[in-house]
From Swiss-Prot:
Keywords: Chloroplast, Plastid, Ribonucleoprotein, Ribosomal protein, RNA-binding, rRNA-binding
Name listed for the protein in its UniProt record: Small ribosomal subunit protein uS3c
Record carries keyword Ribonucleoprotein: yes
Record localization: Plastid, Chloroplast
Assembly behavior: Part of the 30S ribosomal subunit.
Gene designation: rps3
Species the sequence originates in: Chloranthus spicatus
GO biological processes: translation
GO molecular function: rRNA binding; structural constituent of ribosome
Coiled-coil annotated residue ranges, if any: none
Pfam families attached to this UniProt entry: Ribosomal_S3_C
InterPro entries cross-referenced by the UniProt entry: KH_dom-like_a/b, KH_dom_type_2, KH_sf_prok-type, Ribosomal_S3_C_sf, Ribosomal_uS3_bac-typ, Ribosomal_uS3_C, Ribosomal_uS3_CS
Annotated KH type-2 domain residues: 43-120
Length: 220
């Protein structure tokens, strides 16, 4: 059962919190969700185009959105703050990102504020690990080597366990298959176990590959 549902939704309210912190009337709730998706997509596209890769844990860990009547506060949790700020000076990158999101957003009543926070333990973030694997696969690095290195990163972060899965036409083979590796414990059916999860899609010259990562952080 543990692998058939999203591990984050399965533990929501127990060990996982919400990344969208706001409320709305039932009639306008769907519009609020679409708004969040637009903001996240705009941020991810901008970062992907402009980010400078200077280490193995560059990228977005997750995005948190808080809404008030007159303000939308967006907090971007990144592996390294400098990866976005180095584009064109210390603050130019954030200002340009804010302008781009504001254009997409089209709201006169709410102002937008974007902050960037550096995560304390980047090697324990499944999104950052998945982005690392995606970059390696695009460079035609062996998938086994990329998975092995990812597990080494997770061990540096003192995680209790990690499972990495890659599916699709791996290494350009005609028949799609699933390859996975696990190190340590990953108790997917234990609700009190804090497990971070990521599902990531990467386009390679051979086609689309799916990357899934489960990280067992702690037992509450």
């Amino acid at each position: 059962m543990g692998q058939k549902i999203n591990p984050l939704g399965f533990r929501l309210g127990a060990t996982q919190g919400h990344h969208s912190l706001w409320f709305a009337q039932p009639k306008s709730y769907s519009r609020g969700l679409q708004e969040d998706e637009k903001i996240k997509d705009c941020i991810k596209n901008y970062v992907q185009k402009n980010m400078r890769i200077s280490s193995d844990y560059e990228g977005i860990a997750h995005i948190e959105i808080k809404k008030r009547i007159d303000l939308i506060q967006v907090i971007i949790y990144m592996g390294s703050k400098n990866s976005l700020m180095l584009i064109e000076g210390p603050t130019r990158g954030i200002e340009e990102l804010q302008i781009n999101v504001q254009k997409e957003f089209h709201s006169a009543n709410q102002r937008l504020n974007i902050d960037i926070t550096e995560v304390a333990n980047p090697y324990g973030q499944p999104n950052l690990l998945a982005e690392y694997i995606a970059r390696q696969l695009k460079k035609r690095v062996s998938f086994r080597k990329a998975m092995k290195k990812t597990i080494e990163f997770a061990e540096q972060a003192d995680t209790k366990g990690i499972q990495v899965q890659i599916s699709g036409r791996i290494d350009g083979k005609e028949i799609a298959r699933v390859e996975w590796v696990r190190e340590g414990r990953v108790p997917l059916q234990t609700i009190r176990a804090k497990i971070d999860y990521c599902s990531y899609t990467v386009r390679t010259i051979h086609g689309v590959l799916g990357i899934k990562i489960w990280v067992f952080v702690d037992d509450k």
